[in-house]
């Protein structure tokens, strides 16, 4: 059995796995902030405050219009991704992250497959996301699923002064892209 076959995913209903979710969200924001500071000299988030806000608003990542998908490898939660509603036809992927020690085992692909299945189940016609420009491996993964680059969209949560450091992508779910 190869590593990819050992990666499993599960959808989460809160409060299940809330501590793992908070830890991965925090780790993602710290890692992303450090890279943004190193590469661009900017620091877009206070990770602790951002996680606290996401936890307060966690219902947006829950059914019927959203979902959180965890990836698990050999019994350890190693990554996650979140889906939320922009409008009745468009969902947004947020906070997709795989712990660096678990990368290259298929966890990101498994999370994305799970999120897109959830988006189709909700009935979204499109899914959007934003991603820091330095996350080239993630962009390759998104493109392999059919995502295309788009302009910044008005519903993005990132302050506009940071949009130049981000890539915006969209997947049309009316086609079978995978």
Pin down the residues of each PLM region.
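Structural signature of beta-strand start/N-cap positions in the alpha/beta core
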Residues: 67, 125-126
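Conserved G/P- and acidic residue-centered "switch" motifs that form tight phosphate/ATP-binding loops
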Residues: 106, 123
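Short polybasic/polar patches that bind polyanions
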Residues: 103, 120, 143
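Loop/helix-junction capping segments adjacent to catalytic residues or to phosphate/diphosphate-binding pockets
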Residues: 15-19, 105, 136
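Acetyl-CoA-dependent GNAT
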Residues: 4-7, 11-94, 99-100, 112-113, ...
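C-terminal "cap" of GNAT-fold acetyltransferases
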Residues: 4-7, 127, 132-136, 140-178
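Active-site acidic-Proline motif in GNAT/NAT acetyltransferases
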Residues: 99-105, 133-134
């Amino acid at each position: 059995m190869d590593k990819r076959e050992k990666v499993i995913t599960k959808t989460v209903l809160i409060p299940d796995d809330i501590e793992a979710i908070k830890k991965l969200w925090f780790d993602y924001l710290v890692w992303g902030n450090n890279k943004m500071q190193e590469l661009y000299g900017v620091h877009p988030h206070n990770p602790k405050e951002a996680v606290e806000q996401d936890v307060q608003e966690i219902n947006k990542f829950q059914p019927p219009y959203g979902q959180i998908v965890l990836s698990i490898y050999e019994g350890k939660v190693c990554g996650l991704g979140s889906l939320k509603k922009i409008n009745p036809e468009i969902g947004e992927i947020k906070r997709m992250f795989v712990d660096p020690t678990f990368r290259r085992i298929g966890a990101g692909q498994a999370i994305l497959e799970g999120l897109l299945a959830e988006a189709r189940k909700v009935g979204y016609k499109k899914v959007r996301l934003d991603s820091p420009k330095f996350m080239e491996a993630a962009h390759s993964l998104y493109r392999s699923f059919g995502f295309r680059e788009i302009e910044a969209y008005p519903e993005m949560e990132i302050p506009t002064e940071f949009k130049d450091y981000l890539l915006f992508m969209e997947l049309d779910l009316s086609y079978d892209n995978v």
